[in-house]
């Protein structure tokens, strides 16, 4: 009997609540219902607001519902609660339920408990989706059967029973998922740690602690990849219990991957260095993507051949919404970098181009500082188009820089993304590059960065 089979047998008579019916939870609920388990959907939407088709489908399978203002009250009468990453682990009601003896878990936590195969886990403030995808692509190129999930891809728990021990799971994990994790992956990679999501975590200490949970439960055979160029990340080296690997864009490392002075990505261990691929042969632009490749190389080294790594480097075209080329109109190139929800990611995007840009920025206020944007924007941006709740803060940070008076930077304020795109088109000249690089989350205008990116692409394609 597999761990998954035993798990479902043991909870057969339990009452299980699911907070929210997002894509991952919907498949999970269907799985649990198919096992004959009593399920309750908890959602703050009222019955009138709830998706009618989903309601009818789940009701027909025997699912209960707790909807509206007091949707969480029912969890005190349940045995197990699956929270979504969007439901803060230290939420007052969740905390009370936990103290009352209710088991609080998540799709990823339970997947880690039941997964029969090796798990690669990636987290970080920036670069985690691309790095997760690169690891997955490299393993696929080597002929592995790969399952990608977590914060990207699909829910993995619904397919855990189809996995074998020769498969590989590659998961991206956010701080919201990690804060309650009690297991670590076999291979862990932390791309970087910079201020992010402080509107939820409250303090940088809690945010770093959540990220550190990725490696807090390792054993002696675990592998960890850390960023030597990022102070907060390399501080976590003392927590590593297994093999420590590092990467650097700036200098050679003792064990791990680095970029040498000739532009070659290298791997070094036990005094032996192997050159792998030149940075100019990597299809996706930007020095930050070189860092993502170094992270992935260190993570898969020994499992993947150099030939497979080079194949991915030369052919992988990137992930949607990450400096994604949209189109060229009248000699002006348009890029969608909607994923750039933090200043560090925006700076990385600006450094991907060898010219001054027209940048559309602004959005939801995550209570993070924008001062780091001041110098790069004044140096690398010719026109800054601002919208959203953070427009004032970004403009203040940029204009208070000593570089601003001589930069020639023009700042334009707009109210909508439609207006921003039309303004950029009007002000752009042949040879210009326009990027959507928000530096913020999208919650004030869109449900997520993907919706914002898709809207931007639609607007550009309609020009």
Predicted regions: what they are:
Residues 40-44, 68-69, 106-109, 241-260, ...:
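Beta-strand->loop->alpha-helix junctions that form or flank phosphate-binding loops
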Residues 55, 373-431:
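C-terminal helical cap/extension that packs against the catalytic core
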Residues 39-43, 148, 170, 246, ...:
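Short beta-strand "acidic-cap" motif of Rossmann-like dinucleotide-binding folds
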Residues 38-45, 224-228, 360-361, 380-389:
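Short internal beta-strands
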Residues 1-106, 110, 396:
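N-terminal leader/targeting and accessory segments in enzymes
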Residues 22, 45, 152, 229-230, ...:
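Residues in the short beta-alpha loop(s) of Rossmann-like NAD(P)-binding domains
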């Amino acid at each position: 009997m597999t761990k998954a089979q035993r798990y479902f047998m043991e909870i057969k008579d339990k009452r299980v609540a699911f907070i929210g019916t997002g894509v991952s939870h919907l498949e999970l609920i269907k799985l649990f219902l198919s096992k004959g388990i009593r399920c309750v959907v908890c959602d703050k939407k009222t019955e009138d607001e709830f998706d009618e088709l989903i309601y009818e489908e789940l009701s027909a399978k025997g699912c209960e519902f707790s909807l509206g203002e007091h949707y969480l009250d029912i969890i005190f009468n349940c045995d197990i609660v699956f929270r979504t990453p969007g439901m803060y682990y230290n939420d007052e009601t969740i905390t009370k339920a936990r103290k009352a003896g209710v088991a609080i878990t998540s799709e990823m936590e339970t997947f880690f408990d039941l997964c029969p195969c090796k798990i690669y886990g990636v987290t970080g403030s920036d670069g985690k989706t691309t790095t997760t995808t690169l690891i997955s692509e490299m393993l696929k190129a080597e002929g592995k059967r790969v399952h990608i999930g977590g914060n990207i891809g699909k829910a993995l728990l619904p397919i855990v029973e189809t996995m074998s021990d020769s498969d590989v799971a590659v998961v991206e994990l956010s701080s919201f998922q990690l804060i309650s994790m009690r297991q670590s992956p076999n291979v862990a990679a932390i791309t970087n740690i910079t201020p992010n999501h402080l509107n939820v975590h409250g303090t940088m200490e809690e945010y770093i602690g959540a990220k550190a949970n990725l490696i807090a439960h390792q054993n002696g055979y675990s592998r960890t990849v850390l960023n030597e160029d990022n102070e907060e990340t390399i501080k976590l080296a003392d927590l590593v219990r297994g093999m420590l690997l590092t990467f650097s864009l700036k200098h050679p490392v003792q064990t791990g991957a680095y970029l040498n002075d000739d532009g070659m990505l290298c791997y070094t261990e036990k005094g032996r260095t192997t050159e792998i691929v030149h940075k100019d042969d990597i299809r996706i632009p930007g020095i930050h993507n070189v860092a993502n490749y170094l992270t992935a190389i260190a993570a898969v080294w020994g499992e993947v051949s150099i030939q497979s790594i080079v194949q991915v480097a030369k052919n992988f075209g990137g992930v949607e919404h990450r400096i994604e080329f949209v189109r060229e109109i009248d000699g002006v190139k348009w890029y969608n970098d909607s994923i750039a929800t933090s200043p560090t990611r925006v700076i990385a995007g600006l450094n991907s181009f060898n010219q001054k840009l027209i940048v559309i920025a602004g959005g939801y206020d995550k209570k993070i500082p924008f001062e780091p944007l001041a110098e790069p924007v004044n140096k690398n941006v010719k026109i800054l188009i601002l919208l959203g709740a953070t427009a004032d803060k970004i403009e203040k940070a940029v204009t208070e820089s000593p570089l601003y008076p001589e930069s020639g930077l023009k700042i334009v304020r707009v109210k909508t993304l439609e207006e921003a795109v039309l303004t950029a088109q009007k002000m752009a000249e042949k040879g210009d590059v326009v990027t959507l690089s928000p530096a913020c989350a999208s919650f004030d205008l869109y449900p997520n960065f993907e919706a914002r990116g898709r809207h931007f692409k639609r607007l550009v394609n309609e020009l």
